[in-house]
Amino acid sequence: MARPDGRLPDHLRPVTLTRGWSTHPEGSVLVEFGATRVLCTASVTEGVPRWRKGSGLGWVTAEYAMLPRATNTRSDRESVKGRVGGRTHEISRLIGRSLRASIDLKALGENSVVLDCDVLQADGGTRTAAITGAYVALYDAVTWLAARRSLAGRPENVMHRSVAAVSVGVVAGEPRLDLNYDEDATAEVDLNVVCTGTGDFVEVQGTGEAGVFSRGQLDALLDLAVAGCLDLAEAQRKALS
């Protein structure tokens, strides 16, 4: 069955990582996975949360949000609702966990980095695009710290592994890489996979949206995801070169 945008099952959407998109943050990246666009900024502050003080370790955390009209119908801002929704909180924590896997918190020292990932336009894969872009923004923030002699080591030693993420799923019985919204909405199986630049797993989230799935299907999806993440890692390397 043909995909909505004509891609082969194992092809990513066009990926673009534009560094320095915002003037003020220590690191900023506009990441595009096809029509999905996420602005990722990395803001550095000296010091760490109270519970972390005196440990010699840094801290990296994340916040995720969507613009009201990032989708085909407008959603109220969560600030107006007076609370952060469960989905938003879950994705924020996922991004934070994923990016902490990329950095040596001891080498970061008692500095904090907050990653803000704001979805400008959503067409599926917003959380995976956010993770992929946030890695590049975090790297630039660490480079900024190194230039101020606020780190014990070089940026490439502090950022000791790259991290990227991609969605995979079974749509119309076919394993597919990097689902857009139309595919995600009809997927029988849906996974979000976070990998390092060497293909090791950081996190795997998956559900059988329309029932159950086999071990063989899971293996096929993970193979697709690893290949996709390795391609994304190469895009990150090129963006940072």
Curated annotation (Swiss-Prot):
The gene is rph. InterPro entries: ExoRNase_PH_dom1 (IPR001247), ExoRNase_PH_dom2 (IPR015847), ExoRNase_PH_dom2_sf (IPR036345), PNPase/RNase_PH_dom_sf (IPR027408), Ribosomal_Su5_D2-typ_SF (IPR020568), RNase_PH (IPR050080), RNase_PH_bac-type (IPR002381), RNase_PH_CS (IPR018336). Phosphate binds at residues 87, 125-127. One of its GO terms (molecular function) is tRNA binding. GO terms for biological process: rRNA catabolic process; rRNA processing; tRNA processing. It comes from the Bacteria. This is Ribonuclease PH. PANTHER family: EXOSOME COMPLEX COMPONENT, EXOSOME COMPLEX COMPONENT RRP41. It holds the Pfam family RNase_PH. Phosphorolytic 3'-5' exoribonuclease that plays an important role in tRNA 3'-end maturation. Removes nucleotide residues following the 3'-CCA terminus of tRNAs; can also add nucleotides to the ends of RNA molecules by using nucleoside diphosphates as substrates, but this may not be physiologically important. Probably plays a role in initiation of 16S rRNA degradation (leading to ribosome degradation) during starvation. The keyword Transferase applies. It catalyses: tRNA(n+1) + phosphate = tRNA(n) + a ribonucleoside 5'-diphosphate. Keywords: Nucleotidyltransferase, RNA-binding, rRNA processing, Transferase, tRNA processing, tRNA-binding. Homohexameric ring arranged as a trimer of dimers. Its EC number is 2.7.7.56. Belongs to the RNase PH family.
